[in-house]
């Protein structure tokens, strides 16, 4: 059931093997194989494939993926995947932080969708619509309006409220 050891090191073999296993409903069986492959050969297609796996323990999968932050802290693909996994695990605050950093590094349609979903979930339909629209622009190969993305992120992560001024007792 595992990739034979002689060819396990070849990403060109691991990728279609794992994709086939995921398609066959055997994703949990290849999760470790994908983690090992990513440790040997950091490739975006392997990372995206890892995100397709939906383990019963989503929090464990998120923790495993967060281990990659050390060497890949500024990898927009990883941050997007972490946002997706955080949502699956029910960690909305982590998802917001990861997707925000991902968008700062490289705006993508998928990241805009996550922002839109988070805003929609909060009931901010206008801002969600803006995020979705920017994602559609990116998916169509157009340039996103950075100001609109920043506005949606600001709504998603408002700055802390200033402390009210205390009256001078004099």
Give the ranges of each region predicted by the language model.
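Alpha-helical linker/edge segments of TPR/alpha-solenoid repeat scaffolds
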Residues: 53-68, 123-134, 141-145, 154-170
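TPR/TPR-like (Sel1-like) alpha-helical repeat modules
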Residues: 31-44, 103-107, 119-144
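Solenoid-repeat scaffolds in large eukaryotic assemblies
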Residues: 14, 27-30, 61, 78, ...
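Alpha-helical junction/boundary sensor with strong preference for TPR arrays
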Residues: 3-7, 41, 57, 69-72, ...
């Amino acid at each position: 059931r595992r990739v034979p050891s002689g060819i396990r090191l070849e990403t060109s073999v691991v990728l279609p093997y794992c994709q086939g296993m995921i398609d066959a409903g055997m994703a949990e069986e290849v999760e470790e194989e994908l983690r090992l492959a990513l440790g040997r050969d950091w490739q975006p297609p392997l990372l995206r494939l890892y995100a397709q796996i939906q383990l019963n323990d989503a929090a464990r999968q998120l923790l495993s993926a967060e281990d990659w932050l050390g060497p890949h802290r500024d990898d927009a693909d990883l941050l997007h995947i972490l946002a997706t996994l955080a949502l699956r695990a029910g960690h909305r605050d982590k998802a917001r932080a990861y997707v925000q950093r991902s968008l700062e590094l490289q705006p993508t349609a998928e990241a805009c969708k996550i922002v839109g979903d988070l805003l929609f979930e909060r009931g901010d339909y206008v801002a969600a619509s803006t995020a979705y629209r920017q994602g559609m622009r990116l998916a169509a190969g157009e340039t996103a309006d950075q100001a609109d993305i920043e506005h949606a992120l600001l709504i998603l992560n408002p700055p802390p409220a200033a402390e009210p001024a205390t009256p001078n007792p004099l």
